[in-house]
UniProtKB/Swiss-Prot annotation:
Transmembrane segments: 1-21, 30-50, 72-92, 119-139, 140-160, 177-197, 200-220, 241-261, 274-294, 301-319, 331-351, 365-385, 403-423, 454-474, 505-525, 619-639
Catalytic function, reaction form: a ubiquinone + NADH + 5 H(+)(in) = a ubiquinol + NAD(+) + 4 H(+)(out)
Any coiled-coil regions, as ranges: none
Pfam families assigned: NADH5_C (PF06455), Proton_antipo_M (PF00361), Proton_antipo_N (PF00662)
Organism in which the protein naturally occurs: Podospora anserina (strain S / ATCC MYA-4624 / DSM 980 / FGSC 10383)
UniProt record, GO biological process: ATP synthesis coupled electron transport; electron transport coupled proton transport
Organism lineage string: Eukaryota, Fungi, Dikarya, Ascomycota, Pezizomycotina
NCBIfam families: NDH_I_L, PRK06590.1
Primary localisation category: mitochondrion
Name this polypeptide is given: NADH-ubiquinone oxidoreductase chain 5
Top enzyme category: translocase
UniProt entry keywords in alphabetical sequence: Electron transport, Membrane, Mitochondrion, Mitochondrion inner membrane, NAD, Respiratory chain, Translocase, Transmembrane, Transmembrane helix, Transport, Ubiquinone
């Protein structure tokens, strides 16, 4: 059963990719979708067997690298963390496969698309089930390649190609540091196997743990789009909407958070790494929320909300609340996939226009889509008793429950980020569905926007159910005080970092309710201003101050401008100079060009000795004879100098 979870998506990828013409579009869709659905059912059974019974399963297939001091076995382990990650990955993957049947129906490259989707699912399974860092790195690179292939799926569009290259290069920065971290683990511990590394972690130098932790954190920053290496995520929205839902909301972007959770037995032994995680997550949350408020592309707004929620997960990791981070990761996957698929339904209905300022009044045409996007937005803003409420508010409470300066400061910053998250969620819903119609007449009269078929709507309904009930049902499993779900030590919390009881019982009720109170009040204020004081808003936006503020945040804090002007150009200039001086200069001079020129000059000088005069040859013979006689009287040590002198004379 456990091997089937890994192999079935790969079989679907191979059949759809290599035999696509034989099986046809319908055959490729049927094979890939059925394989992923079967894999999802098996993963739910694995979740029950491994998670509830605390019976980790390890499968060793074959020895991959076998040397005197370094051994790697191609093996997989299924513990509580692994099966918990498989649930959102495979459920959302299967729903996205089904959704894509309708969404991509008019595309001529269906087989290639479904092959890429199945390959991505396979690589993600490799990443979360690997039992060592090297095999995990195979899955890590695999999902990066699949992201590149899927973002540039419509390869005739220049923007799609630019975005895919941007995503690939930004992730290479993180991959470079992750590789350095793996080398540091190998150098200090002699192995990359999880069980060996984690059992030896308490006994190594704290500074080594700091270096390893920072390298792993930078790797996670790139993959999970934390501030600094976040530039690729909004650009990756150029791919098809099902790709955005699968990769850039639910699965691949959570790989960095998964890496930090998996490495919890390592990073728990250095509080500096945890403090870096705490502040990095807080800055990312408020940074992305501010940018998201000033975007007009519906998919980019949702992308920035993804970045904000990933910041929340990193905050939870910085608080050593790994189970809360995992719980929020799973909850977020469901409602964020629902938001993306709902946005895809809207885009599909309005002839592929993504600027939500041109929508308006779509509630009458897309009632189901409005309902599911309302559910997903309520879950995103942590409305009471929705799925997101149980995890997001618990992270904020955990920050306050640490009762330290950093904890309270991060609580305030993350609450501000949550307020902005609410504002742009209300903005998207209001301008898309509730405001006056702003679109062209084609949306409403000639070619009215309509709900999609069963393949488009069924995944939305299933994800809406998860977005309402999943958090309530699984709260006690993941973050309950008496839960033994992680009894297999897949997540490790150092006893001095345990704050669960303080979070549950010591945080004042006011600070538990504060995010919700601010969320509701600011939403009401924003709607009131938009509805009744719209002229004031327009005057402010047209003023010099409003123009500058809007431009600064709309241009994403000008970070891309800074990168292009000062970092990218610097690297390109450095590369150009290195090419000019080293590659085309000294290497050519001492290498092929210089060697060839020297040999030609040497041969010309040698050939000039041939003068065709007998007296000259007699002189050469006489000189050689004298040198032979001198050789017997001179020390052997002078011979090299003599030969060198003759060589110089002949080349002049």
């Amino acid at each position: 059963m456990y091997l089937s979870i890994i192999i079935l998506p790969l079989l679907g990828c191979i059949v759809s990719g290599f035999l696509g013409r034989k099986v046809g579009v319908k055959g490729a869709q049927l094979i890939t979708c059925s394989n992923v659905v079967i894999t999802t059912i098996l993963s739910i059974l694995a979740f029950i067997e491994v998670g509830f019974n605390n019976i980790p399963v390890t499968i060793n297939l074959f020895r991959w690298i076998d040397s005197e001091w370094f051994n790697i076995i191609w093996g997989f382990q299924f513990d509580s963390l692994t099966v918990s990650m498989l649930i959102p990955v495979l459920i959302i993957s299967s729903l996205v496969h089904i959704y894509s049947i309708s969404y991509m129906s008019s595309d001529p490259h269906n087989q290639r698309f479904f092959s890429y989707l199945s390959l991505f699912t396979f690589m993600m399974i490799i990443l979360v089930t690997a039992n060592n860092y090297l095999l995990m790195f195979v899955g890590w690179e695999g999902v990066g390649v699949c992201s590149y292939l899927l973002v540039s799926f419509w390869f005739t569009r220049i923007a799609a190609n630019q975005s895919s290259i941007s995503a690939f290069l930004a992730n290479r920065v993180g991959d470079c540091f992750l590789t350095i971290g793996m080398f540091a683990i190998l150098w200090s511990l002699g192995n990359l196997d999880y069980s060996t590394v984690f059992s030896l972690a308490p006994y190594i130098n704290s500074k080594v743990v700091l270096i390893i932790g920072i390298c792993l954190l930078i790797g996670a920053m790139a993959k999970s789009s934390q501030v600094g290496l976040h530039v690729w995520l909004p650009m990756a929205m150029e791919g098809p909407t099902p790709v955005s839902a699968l990769i850039h909301a639910a699965t691949m972007v959570t790989a960095g958070v998964y890496l930090l959770m998996r490495s919890s037995p390592l990073i728990e032994y250095n509080s500096t790494v945890l403090l870096l995680c705490l502040w990095l997550g807080a800055i990312t949350t408020v940074f992305s929320s501010l940018i998201g408020l000033f975007q007009q592309d519906i998919k980019k707004v949702i992308a920035y909300s993804t970045m904000s929620q990933l910041g929340m997960m990193v905050i939870a990791i910085g608080l050593s609340s790994y189970n809360v981070a995992l719980f929020h990761l799973i909850n977020h996957a469901f409602y964020k996939a629902l938001l993306f698929l709902g946005a895809g339904s809207v885009i599909h209905a309005v002839a592929d226009n993504q600027d939500f300022r041109k929508y308006g009044g779509l509630i009458n045409f897309l009632p189901l889509t409005y309902s599911v996007m309302l559910i997903a937005s309520l879950s995103l803003v942590a409305f009471p008793f929705m799925t997101g409420f149980y995890s997001k508010d618990f992270i904020l409470e955990s920050a306050y429950g640490q009762f330290s300066f950093s904890g309270v400061a991060v609580y305030i910053i993350a609450t501000i980020g949550a307020i902005f998250t609410t504002l742009y969620s209300v903005k998207v819903l209001y301008l898309t569905f509730l405001s006056n119609p702003n679109g062209t007449r084609a949306y409403y009269n000639y070619k009215p926007a309509l709900e999609g078929d069963l393949f488009l709507t069924l995944p939305l309904i299933i994800l809406a159910i998860f977005s309402i009930f999943f958090g309530f049902i699984t709260k006690d499993i993941f973050i309950g005080l008496g839960s033994n779900f992680f009894g297999d030590n897949s997540l490790f919390i150092h006893p001095t970092h345990e704050i669960m009881i303080d979070t549950e019982f010591a945080v004042p009720v006011l600070f538990k309710l504060l995010p919700f109170i601010f969320t509701i009040s600011f939403s009401i204020i924003a709607l009131t201003i938009s509805e009744f004081l719209s002229e004031l808003v327009i005057y402010f936006k047209l003023s010099r101050l409003g123009y500058n503020i809007f431009g600064f945040f709309n241009q994403r804090f000008l970070i891309e401008l800074f990168y292009n002007k000062y970092i990218t150009n610097l690297i390109l200039d450095l590369g150009g100079q290195m090419t000019k001086i080293l590659d085309k200069g000294s290497i050519e001079l001492f290498g092929p060009f210089g060697l060839e020129k020297g040999l030609v000059n040497f041969s010309k000088n040698i050939s000039s000795l041939s003068t065709s005069h007998v007296t000259t040859y007699a002189l050469y013979i006489l000189v050689a004879f004298i040198l032979y006689l001198l050789y017997n009287y001179l020390s052997f040590n002078f011979l090299p100098f003599l030969i060198a002198g003759l060589t110089i004379l002949t080349t002049i």
